[in-house]
Curated annotation (Swiss-Prot):
Required for maturation of urease via the functional incorporation of the urease nickel metallocenter. This is Urease accessory protein UreF. The keyword Chaperone applies. Keywords: Chaperone, Cytoplasm, Nickel insertion. It comes from the Bacteria. InterPro entries: UreF, UreF_sf.
Length: 234
């Protein structure tokens, strides 16, 4: 078995680490407005959760965050730090509520601290300095730095990024609705089947066509800020 970081199974192992729910960045504490959708009665059943999560995946993640992640992977790999900084600013500006912005800033900060402490990342020449030089790195910016440094193929990295988001949303629904564990697995199986096509489309979507226009999500997130009883931070 190859132990070369540029080939063999090691990039896959690193990818599994990045996509793991055990990654200590606090993702499990956020629902991205889903908790308010449950509170107001929009999401009450497994079918409701499938529709809500699927819509956010299709209309926000796939049309904005996914192509931005693809562009970030290329910019990191090409050494284009100016492009990385521009995309970071674009992503921060795209967060429509204080909770959504605080979420990506906190998770980005936590991941930067983690990577700086991992020899597997910090020991690679130049990568730590490039990452810590960024002002307020958003989570996808820090995440793609690790993926690029570990030479994970772009399509695999993007698939794992979307899967990790999807898994977190489904687990939030399981807790908040609540749903059973089997229902959660059905949601992952059904919604996960769309990921390959979304990844392929995201990699060739022109920047002029990027869009995260999801007013329902923005309203849910803003209403969650004053929700009386909450399990989640967003």
């Amino acid at each position: 078995m190859s132990t070369n970081p540029a080939g063999g199974l090691l990039p896959l192992i690193r990818l599994l680490q990045l996509a793991s729910p055990a990654l200590p960045v606090g993702a499990y504490t956020y629902s991205q407005g889903l908790e308010w959708a449950v509170e107001c009665g929009t999401v009450r059943t497994e079918a409701d959760a499938r529709r809500w999560i699927g819509d956010v995946l299709e209309w926000s993640l796939a049309r904005f965050e996914a192509p931005l992640v693809a562009r970030l992977l290329a910019a990191w790999a090409d050494g284009d730090d100016a492009e990385v900084a521009r995309l970071n600013e674009d992503f921060l500006a795209s967060r429509e509520t204080s909770e959504l912005r605080a979420e990506t800033v906190q998770m980005g900060y936590s991941l930067v601290r983690l990577l700086a402490d991992l020899d597997a990342f910090a020991g690679l020449p130049g990568w730590k300095a490039r990452l810590v030089a960024l002002d307020t790195p958003a989570f996808p910016v820090a995440w793609t730095a690790a993926a690029a440094a570990w030479r994970i193929p772009a399509d695999q990295a993007l698939s794992a990024y979307l899967w990790a988001w999807l898994e977190n949303q489904v687990m939030a629904a399981v807790k908040a609705v609540p749903l059973g564990q089997s229902a959660g697995q059905r949601l992952l199986a059904d919604l996960g089947a769309a990921v390959p096509a979304l990844v392929e489309a995201a990699q060739c979507l022109p920047e002029a066509e990027w869009s995260n226009f999801t007013p329902g999500l923005a309203i849910a997130s803003s209403r969650h800020e004053t929700q009386y009883t909450r399990l989640f931070r967003s």
